Amino acid sequence: MGELFRSEEMTLAQLFLQSEAAYCCVSELGELGKVQFRDLNPDVNVFQRKFVNEVRRCEEMDRKLRFVEKEIRKANIPIMDTGENPEVPFPRDMIDLEANFEKIENELKEINTNQEALKRNFLELTELKFILRKTQQFFDEMADPDLLEESSSLLEPSEMGRGTPLRLGFVAGVINRERIPTFERMLWRVCRGNVFLRQAEIENPLEDPVTGDYVHKSVFIIFFQGDQLKNRVKKICEGFRASLYPCPETPQERKEMASGVNTRIDDLQMVLNQTEDHRQRVLQAAAKNIRVWFIKVRKMKAIYHTLNLCNIDVTQKCLIAEVWCPVTDLDSIQFALRRGTEHSGSTVPSILNRMQTNQTPPTYNKTNKFTYGFQNIVDAYGIGTYREINPAPYTIITFPFLFAVMFGDLGHGILMTLFAVWMVLKESRILSQKNENEMFSTIFSGRYIILLMGVFSIYTGLIYNDCFSKSLNIFGSSWSVRPMFDIYNWTEETLRGNPVLQLNPAVTGVFGGPYPFGIDPIWNIATNKLTFLNSFKMKMSVILGIIHMLFGVSLSLFNHTYFKKPLNIYFGFIPEIIFMTSLFGYLVILIFYKWTAYNAKTSEKAPSLLIHFINMFLFSYGDSGNSMLYSGQKGIQCFLVVVALLCVPWMLLFKPLVLRRQYLRRKHLGTLNFGGIRVGNGPTEEDAEIIQHDQLSTHSEDAEEPTEDEVFDFGDTMVHQAIHTIEYCLGCISNTASYLRLWALSLAHAQLSEVLWTMVIHIGLKVKSLAGGLALFFIFAAFATLTVAILLIMEGLSAFLHALRLHWVEFQNKFYSGTGFKFLPFSFEHIREGKFDD
């Protein structure tokens, strides 16, 4: 059915790689990205494998590159990305790479260490400069006789009486500004008020040499008397992480020190600038190549990690690997192996042998940028079983269509389409930017899904004739009120006296026929609008749901045919399709029949389909108030119900009984027993050897029909079949009801849109003055914001999730088992894209 409708045919192959060529061959296979290696050493510890040292060396180089990258980003230097895909370095080149990275790392560490020491020295000199400047102001203030009274508490009364000369000690330092209040309280309490503290803020913040952050600090000077207070003050300063600096006592000494400090600061600033320039040059040179280095190192690491999955023969000259690969790509894989052998200079070619296996191969569905998003929707439910029907190509149409049935609005569909078209047109630019925003990346990866959802929403919006809750009168309404004036003698008084009047479509000229496309715009102003639309959308939901489920059941036939399971066709597919069509397919026929059999004149006598369908199961036909739809209805409905009931034992009993009979017959005829020696014609040991051109088994799942060695358990088979039968029969009812969400979501979206129009934009349209025009500007902004936030994003997400549910449960469970595992080829693609995470 083609590569899109069914997963690729896979084969298990064995590779024989010469030791000197293994690295280059695996490198070429990584560039190709078409093989998935199997681990042939599952019981060997990861630290005991052959190439563990090479992997560690690659990890060490990777660590050094991450350090360099961190420094580059810290310096706000852009990393150059030319999109280049460098070739994998040879193993002998690893030494040069290690030496280069070691040199860059050591150089950066040395620069950082020197720069940190210089900055710390610069900080100390800067703080000392401010201390000398501020303390001079403090001492000038202390010379003021008015301050003598403030400092009198530092002197004992007896000493003041004796006229002893005043001998005060002091310490000066710098402290973080936010610690000043606590620092001051601690000094006061510990020293009992016998110290004098003066502090002044440093206007400019100072750079912390360790963190690089800018910190606001203050200069302080503390006066005290005696060694005991001096020790207490120093301990408090140490506890608050204050930096203390020596400060001369005389103004002349302070002036000379300040001059020397300024000179040293100027010299140090020059050295710092030169150091920073050198650091920038090193980082800029590294920024030009770091992406290429990352790719090279990650490729080498991936190759050695893959080589650790291989076996080594006893001669130590050959590596043996097992890979899953698509059959269609065998030639390109052979060519890649030849190319790798040539690059390595080996004279012995690498060998690829296909193997026979009963193991289930991985599932590989080829995708492009358009089908990728839809395949992800399917894979999110479960990876398809090998070679079963792939729902993705059908989902491309059904998913956006069912979404649009719930979301249908012309205006909202246009907005969604425009957004998707913008992403599609700008996809190359957006991809090159490598946006790391996870939410935007998710939306961008589904740009084609959003595009189709928007296009289908425009289509369903035209059918509903709904654009921002308003109808478009494109072709002119088919309804006319004029004949009601002629036939029923309506007058102007009739219009004034009756707030609501009903048009009679049975009157000639009132209804001129169906609207050319979609729903007549006159229904937008009708009071019974919801009654009409609910009936239409409910029946439409049932019809679409039953067709969708019948299509899913029909797809199961292709699976049964491909996997050669005739029992599933005779005792699964046929009764399932009969059961669904005899009950729910008949309901669809009744809906279409009622639409065509009754017109405006006879619609009053139209019976209720709901009551008819319920009576069909109850075999109740005595209700005279609900007339028959057609002659012979009773007999046909009784026949259909009986047929549906007969399908239940057909699905439940026949398959287990046939399987049991086949098992007993095989057990009786499959082997003979002569003297306790079992004789048979099973495969020999030689048949299981590696062969070059064998064909992989079509279906390697657990077979439906047990082999002669398997013990057939009739009880388990019966229970399994009973579960399947009950699930299908009840699922037909519940799944049909589940499709009514199409009607419910469509109704909710239309009502929300109408409420938003009435409660927001209509307010601005009602005001006829100039102020109303000005108010409309702001009201429209609110209307646009609410439309995008509620109706496009929230309602769109809700409809998206409901469409997911309808596909995962109601559609895919009819034919899709989803019990496989994904094909994960060894590929350098993610490394090339800059996704360096393992």
From Swiss-Prot:
Cellular localisation: Cytoplasmic vesicle, Clathrin-coated vesicle membrane; Cytoplasmic vesicle, Secretory vesicle, Synaptic vesicle membrane; Melanosome
Its membrane topology, per UniProt? Multi-pass membrane protein
| Pfam families noted in UniProt | V_ATPase_I
- Residue spans, topological domain Cytoplasmic: 1-388, 427-441, 556-573, 660-725, 811-838
Does Signal count among this protein's keywords? no
Name a single GO cellular component. Answer: vacuolar proton-transporting V-type ATPase complex
Q: By its UniProt entry, which InterPro entries does this protein fall under?
A: V-ATPase_116kDa_su, V-type_ATPase_116kDa_su_euka
Query: Under what name is this protein listed?
Result: V-type proton ATPase 116 kDa subunit a 1
Quaternary form? Answer: V-ATPase is a heteromultimeric enzyme made up of two complexes: the ATP-hydrolytic V1 complex and the proton translocation V0 complex. The V1 complex consists of three catalytic AB heterodimers that form a heterohexamer, three peripheral stalks each consisting of EG heterodimers, one central rotor including subunits D and F, and the regulatory subunits C and H. The proton translocation complex V0 consists of the proton transport subunit a, a ring of proteolipid subunits c9c'', rotary subunit d, subunits e and f, and the accessory subunits ATP6AP1/Ac45 and ATP6AP2/PRR. Interacts with SPAAR.
Protein family: Belongs to the V-ATPase 116 kDa subunit family.
Give residue spans on the Vacuolar membrane side. Answer: 408-409, 472-535, 595-639, 751-771
Gene name of the encoded protein: ATP6V0A1
Described by its record, this protein's role is as follows: Subunit of the V0 complex of vacuolar(H+)-ATPase (V-ATPase), a multisubunit enzyme composed of a peripheral complex (V1) that hydrolyzes ATP and a membrane integral complex (V0) that translocates protons. V-ATPase is responsible for the acidification of various organelles, such as lysosomes, endosomes, the trans-Golgi network, and secretory granules, including synaptic vesicles. In certain cell types, can be exported to the plasma membrane, where it is involved in the acidification of the extracellular environment. Required for assembly and activity of the vacuolar ATPase.
Please provide the Gene Ontology terms (biological process) for this protein: pH reduction; proton transmembrane transport; vacuolar acidification
**Phosphothreonine: residues carrying this PTM:** 250, 360
Query: According to its UniProt record, where is this protein mainly located?
Result: membrane
